[in-house]
Amino acid sequence: MSESPVSLSSLTAGDKATVSQIDLPPADRPRLMEMGLLVGTPIELIRFAPMGDPVEIKVRGYNLSLRRHEAEKILVAPS
């Protein structure tokens, strides 16, 4: 049985998950899609910056930094 989706920002360093939903405004979604962050994409949370913002994730073989407010709107299914 798979776990319920949680926000990307609630993961801890080293956690792996799969993107299940992106609840950002339509104007912000194309930028993430261009960087390869799509529903169904596996990700790994690498680290939070010292003050908690930004959040660094590994997606499709490269590291990507997101603002914490963006990470809070991305729902993932933990692996």
Language model features: what each stretch is:
Residues 1-79:
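Compact, glycine-rich, soluble single-domain proteins
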